[in-house]
Amino acid sequence: MVSMLPKADAATGVIRKSYAQLPEVVNVPNLIEMQLQSFVWFQEEGLRELIEEISPIKDFVGNRLELEFIGYEFREPRLSEYECTQRDQTYSVPLYVKARLIVKTTGEIKEPFDLFFGDIPLMTALGTFITSGTERVVVSQLLRSPGVYFTISDDPATGRPLCHTNLIPSRGAWLEFETSNRDVISVKIDGRRKIPVSTLLRAIGYSDDLDILNLFEVIDNDPERHYIQSSIDRDPLIKDEISALIDIYSRLRPGDPPNADNARKLINEMFFDPQHYDLGKVGRYKVNRRLELPSREVGENRALTREDIVAIIQRIIMVNNGQDTPDDIDHLGNRRIRTVGELVQNQFRIGLVRLERVARERMSIVNLEMVTPSALVNIRPVVSAVKEFFGGSQLSQFMDQTNPLAEITNKRRLSAMGPGGLSRERAGFDVRDVHYSHYGRICPIETPEGPNIGLIGSLATYSRINRYGFVETPYRKVYSKLKNNDKKLVGLKLKTEISEKGKVLAAAGSTISEDSFKIISKLPECDISVMPFVSAEVKYMPADEEDRYIIAQANTRLDEKGYFLDDRIEARSAERYVVEPPDKIDYMDVSPKQIFSVAASLIPFLEHDDANRALMGANMQRQAVPLLRAEAPMVATGMEREAARYSGQVIFAKHAGVASSVTSEKIIIRTAEGGHDEYLLKKFVRTNQGTCINQHAIINKGQKIAAGQVLADSSATENGELALGQNCVVAFMSWQGFNYEDAIILSERLVREDAFTSIHITKHELEARDTKLGVEEITRDIPNVGEESLRELDEDGIIRIGAEVGPDDILVGKITPKGETELSAEEKLLRAIFGEKAREVKDTSLRMPHGEWGKVINVRIFSRDSGDDLPARVNKWVQVWVAQKRKVSVGDKLAGRHGNKGVISIIAPVEDMPYLPDGTPVDVVLNPIGVPSRMNLGQILETHLGWAGHLLGFRVATPVFDGADDTVIEDALARSWLSAKAGAIDMSPENKRPSADAHKAIEWIKQQGFDGKKIFDEKHPGLAKEVSLKLWLKDMGVDASALSGAELEKKAYDVSSQSRLPSPIVGKSVLRDGRTGETFDQPVTVGNMYILKLIHLVEDKVHARATGPYSLISQQPLGGKAQFGGQRFGEMEVWAMYAYGTAHNLQEMLTIKSDDIAGRAKAYESIVKGEDVLQPGVPESFKVLVKELQSLGLAVEVINEEVKIAPSEKVSSLNEGNLPASDEISAEILPETLYANTEDISEDSMMSVIDADDQDLVVSSNDEEVSENDERS
C-alpha cells in the first residue's frame, strides 16, 4: 500500500483517508435524542402536570364529593415490539392512576384505588411508535411561541410607522393592541371590537385619569405626541371602573344584561385566573424577557398581571417613539418547537377535560354510600383522544423507512403545519424563507420542493432543543479576560503586564507559569487580559441570546494552543457579517457542518454545489433503495458512520469480549466479566415502503471484540457506514444521443453482477370470517380450479415457503358460502344434525395482484382454535410475505448525491461501452451538458478524487466546507498517474479493488531523479503535481525541467490542447468506442462516482389493462394502477384524433373502449368467437348528459327507433321532392343496425344527406314526418 494511506479503522477494518483540516471539537450528538427525551419528559413530568391540573375533581356545588389523583404508574407492556408488528397491534403500556375519594358530607376518605386510564402508546428505543402494526413517527411542530410581539406597519394614509402588538397566551384569549395615526392606542380582546386602552386600564383597577397618566409619565414624554391622553380623550363618557367594566362586558357578551359584578368576574376569569388563562412556562419566560420585568424568574404565576398590561403599553409607546426596536416574528427566538411529549400532553389534556366534565356530572347524581372512583371516571374520552392523535393527526406520520437515512430525517423533521400552525395556502414567502437565525439550528438546504417548501425543515446536525422548546446550537467560548484566581490562566500568554505597586509581576507577552499564578492569585480580585484564545468550553445558545455576541467561523485559523493566527477575524453578529480583531470575538463555531442537517452533511464537496441542486441531492438520498450488495461511498464525508449508528440498523458491541456464537439469526458475545450479551438479527423484515431490512454478522466466531465495535451490518450499511448506492466508473460524454435530457447509459456488467439489484417485500393477508350465510373456510378444495393452480399449496390450502408465484397465483385458498337468504335457527339445527348437502360456495381465494411476482419468504397463521386473539367474527388470519429481487432496468431512476438525476435509457453490452486505455470499460455514461447549467461541480470533484482513491486503493472522507481542495485532488491524481507509470497498481480481476505497491512506486520515481518519499508525503502539497507534469511533458518530448508553478501548468495545458492527450492532473482519459475501437475526438472526464438507485422504479409505474373495473355512475374505466384502471383519453387527445381523421379509432375510444355497456360486452364476445366487431351503441355518458339536461327542466327525449342511412339514389329522389308513402318507408327502412356501413357512400350522397337535414326533414321509421313546426322538434 502507498505510504499516504491511513491506518485501518480499528472498529471496522476500513481504510478511509480524511482530508479534514479541523479537529472534531464536539462529537455528533445522538441524532434521535430529541424524540427520546421528549417522550421521557411526558412520562415523568408532562403527565404529572396534567393530573395536578385537574385534581381534585369536585362536584358542581362543591359539598358532596371530591376525587383526588395522588399518583400514577405505567405497568409492563402486554406485547413486545416484535409481536405488535406481527399481529397488527399497538405497542402500548397500561396507565394506572391512584385515586382517593372523599365524601364531603360525612368526611369519609375512601381507600386509595388504582384506576385504569387506558393503554398509552409507548415509544420504542428508536424513537418511533407502533400503531396497528405499522411504525409511525410524531414530527415536531415549529410554531410561534406564546409571548408578546411588537411589530411596525406603515399607516396607509400618512405613511407613518405605527406599532401593532399581540399578546399570545398558551391557552386563553388574545390581546391585540393597535396605534392609530391620531395617537390613540386601542385594544381588541379576543378579536372583538376595539376599545381605547384607557378603558381596559380602568377596568383592571386604574380608574382615575391621574392614576393612568402617572403610570406612563416617564415614557409618554414626546412633546408632539401624547398617546395616553389621546386614548383617554377618545372615550369621554367612560370615567370610572364600573362604566369601563360594563362597556367591556357589553362588547364581550352582547346578549347578556350588563352588571358590574358579572363584568369584573368575567375579566378576572379571562386574564387573571390560571384555570382559564395560561401564558405557559414559555410564554411567561418570553414576556419577562421582552418586557424586562423585575420578576425575571419564571415562577408559578403563569396568568397575566396588571403590571404586565401596563408594561406592554409602555413598550408600545417606546416602539412608537423609536426608543425600542420591533420584533422579527420569523426569528427563531420567537418560534418554538413542540416535540412529541408536548403534543401528546396537549392531546391528553383534551381527554382529561372531557373526563373531568363527565365525573362532575356523575358526582351530582350518584349514591354517596355506594360510590367508588371507578363509577365516577369514564376513561373513554382519554383513550379516544390519544388514539385519534396517533392515528389521525397531521403530525403523526407513517414512517419513511426507505433507508436508514430516511428514518433519521423523518425523526428530526420540523413542520410549521398541523393543528395551530400554518397551512400551505396561507403561508407567505417570509415564513418559508431561510432566516439568519437558522444558522446552526435549522438546515438551510433540506426542505421539500413542492408546495411545502420552507414549511417543513430539518434540524441541523448539532442542534438541540432546550426546556422552553427553543432550538440551541453549540459554540466554543473565546476568552480574552480571566479572573486572577482562575486556574485556566496557567500556560496562557498575557496581553498586558501585571504589576503591583509599580513592580512588574509578569510582562506583556509572557506565559503564566505555576509560580507566577500563585503570586497573581493572591492579588485583590481583578480581571487579567490575556491573548484571546478559543477554549474547549462549549456553550449551547438559543437564537435570541446569540444575537448579543460576535461569533467567529469554525474554519478560523488557530495554533495548537487555540490562539488566533490572524489579526482580523471574519465573524457574524446577528444578521451582519463583520471583520473584527481577536479581542472582540466572544464565541466560535464548533464545526463547519454545524449549519447543515444529516442528509446535507452526507454530500461531499457540498460547498461547490448550487443550493437548489444540493436540496435535490439531500432529498434524493432519502429515496435510495437499499441494494443487495451494499457498498459504502469511495468519497464520503465522515457523517456516514454517525447516520448509520443512530439509525438503529447497525449492531454495536455493548461490552468487550469474545464472539462465542455467530449465526445468521443471532450473535452471542462472552464478556470479560463472564456474562453473555445476546444480539438478535433482523432477517428479511419488510419496511413501510416495501424495502427490506436484513442484518448480517460481519464478525467470526472466536474473534476478539472491542466495546463499540460493529458486529452486524444492515441492508444499507457496510462496516458500520451508511451505504446507499454503488461506486461506479463514470464517463462524462454523449453517446449515440442516448443521454439526451439527462438520461443515463448503463453497462450490462452492473445488471449481471447485481450491482443495483434490490429486494422488495410485499405482504398479503386473508381473513376467514363467520358470514351471515355460513362460515368461510381456508382449504385446498376450491371449485373450478385445476391441479396446476394448486400445486404449490399445502393440504390446508396455504402456499408453501419458497414457492415462486406470479400474477393471479393462489396464495391462500378460501371458499365462501353463496346463498340469498340467511338460515333460520331450525334450518341451522337440522343441518347440524343431518350434515350438509353440497353447499353452493364461491372462490374467494387470496391471489397475487396483477403484475406482481416473487418468492414466498414467510407465512404466519393465526387461528382462534390456537388461542390467538383475533377480531370478532374472524376465525383464521393468514399473512404471506412475498419477496422480489429486482434487477436494474431501463426506466429506473438513478441519481448522484449532488442533485444529478436521470432515467436509464439503455443498458448497453459491456463490449459496446467506451473503454479506457488499459481496456477497462466504463460502467455509466452521463451527459456533460448536465453540469454547467446546474452548477453542481461537486460531482466533478467527487469523480476526480474518487478515481485517485480507486486506483491507489483507499477511501476518502472529505467533510463539508472542510475537505479536499483543488491542490489536494490534483496531487492525488498525480500520485495515481505516477503509480500507474511505475506499474505499481495491481488491477488484476481477482482483486475486488485495485491496490498500489508503495515501494515499487517510490523506487521508480527515485530512478526518474525525484524524491519518492516526499512526493507521497502530504506535508509537501503541490510536489506530486509538479513532478507528474514534468514527467508527462518529458514523455511528450518537451523539456520542462526548468519550469515550475504557473509556467509549468501553462506549458502542460498548451501541449495537451495540441496533442489532444490529457495531462495527469486534469482527471481525463482517452477513451475508445467499444463498437468501433476508435478513439473519441476529445479526452473524456472519467472517474469514480457514487450512484444511487431511487425508489421510483419503472416496475411500480408501468401498467397495462385489457378489461377491468368501471366507474359506477359514468361506466367509464377507473383510472390509476392501484384501481387496475385504464389510460385517460382526454379532450386534447380527441382533438389529435380529429386532426388525423381516424374516425373509427375515435369511435372505438369513445364507445366500446369506454362506456358503451352493451357494445363492449358484444365486442368481447365477438373477439372470443373470432367474429368481426359490430358497430357500437349509445355511450352511457350520453344518457348521463340527457338526464342532466332533464334535471334543468328541459324536455329532452331520445328518439329510440333505429335510423338507417338511405342509399344515395334514394336520397337524390328525396331531394327532388319525391316523398314516398308512409307504408313504403316502413317497408323499406327496417329496424336494422343503428349505423349503416358508410364506406360505400360517395361524397355527393353525403352532401345530399346534409341537404335533406337542412330542410328539416328526418327520415325515421315511426311512420311520420318530423317537421319544423312539430312540437317534438
Swiss-Prot record:
It holds the Pfam family RNA_pol_Rpb2_3. Disulfide bonds: none annotated. One of its GO terms (biological process) is DNA-templated transcription. InterPro entries: DNA-dir_RNA_pol_bsu_ext_1_sf, DNA-dir_RNA_pol_bsu_external_1, DNA-dir_RNA_pol_su2, DNA-dir_RNAP_su2_dom, DNA-dir_RNAP_su2_hyb_sf, RNA_pol_bsu_bac, RNA_pol_bsu_CS, RNA_pol_bsu_protrusion. GO terms for cellular component: DNA-directed RNA polymerase complex. Keywords: DNA-directed RNA polymerase, Nucleotidyltransferase, Transcription, Transferase. Its EC number is 2.7.7.6. GO terms for molecular function: DNA binding; DNA-directed RNA polymerase activity; ribonucleoside binding. NCBIfam families: PRK00405.1 (NF001616). The RNAP catalytic core consists of 2 alpha, 1 beta, 1 beta' and 1 omega subunit. When a sigma factor is associated with the core the holoenzyme is formed, which can initiate transcription. PANTHER family: DNA-DIRECTED RNA POLYMERASE I SUBUNIT 2 (PTHR20856). Belongs to the RNA polymerase beta chain family. This is DNA-directed RNA polymerase subunit beta.
